[in-house]
C-alpha cells in the first residue's frame, strides 16, 4: 500500500538541505545517501546522487522522468546471475 496522499511525499530533510545548498551555490557534485525511501523532487533534477544498495553506493543521474519515484527504485539490491547452468561433470561416466 502506498503513502497517504494527505501526508504528501517523503523527503529526507538532510538530503533536501544538501540539494538546496548545491542549487544555491550552483555546484555539481555527487551526494552519497542511504535514504532509498526518499521521493525524487524537482529540485534534484540534474544532480548525481549515489544511493546505497546494501553493499556500495550506485551513482544515479536524476532526470525529469524520475520525479515522483523513489531513489531506491534505481539502485537494485539484488544481482541476478541467471538460473543454474549445466556444470561440468566431475565424475567419470562408465
Swiss-Prot record:
Chain segments annotated as coiled-coil in the UniProt record: none
Pfam families found in the cross-reference section: Ribosomal_S19 (PF00203)
Keyword RNA-binding among UniProt keywords: yes
GO MF annotation list: rRNA binding; structural constituent of ribosome
GO annotation, cellular component aspect: cytoplasm; small ribosomal subunit
Record field: compositional bias (Basic and acidic residues): 83-94
One GO BP: ribosomal small subunit assembly
Keyword rRNA-binding: yes
Cited SUPFAM superfamilies: Ribosomal protein S19
Protein function: Protein S19 forms a complex with S13 that binds strongly to the 16S ribosomal RNA.
HAMAP family: Ribosomal_uS19
PANTHER family: RIBOSOMAL PROTEIN S19P FAMILY MEMBER (PTHR11880), SMALL RIBOSOMAL SUBUNIT PROTEIN US19M (PTHR11880:SF8)
Protein name, as recorded: Small ribosomal subunit protein uS19
Higher taxonomy: Bacteria, Pseudomonadati, Thermomicrobiota, Thermomicrobia, Thermomicrobiales
Amino acid at each position: 500500500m502506498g503513502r497517504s496522499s494527505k501526508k504528501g511525499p517523503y523527503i529526507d530533510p538532510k538530503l533536501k538541505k544538501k540539494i538546496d545548498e548545491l542549487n544555491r551555490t550552483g555546484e555539481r557534485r555527487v551526494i552519497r545517501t542511504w535514504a532509498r525511501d526518499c521521493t525524487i523532487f524537482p529540485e534534484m533534477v540534474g544532480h548525481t546522487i549515489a544511493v546505497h544498495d546494501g553493499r556500495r553506493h550506485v551513482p544515479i543521474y536524476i532526470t525529469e522522468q524520475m520525479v515522483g519515484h523513489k531513489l531506491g527504485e534505481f539502485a537494485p539490491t539484488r544481482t541476478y546471475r541467471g538460473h543454474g547452468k549445466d556444470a561440468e561433470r566431475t565424475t567419470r561416466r562408465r
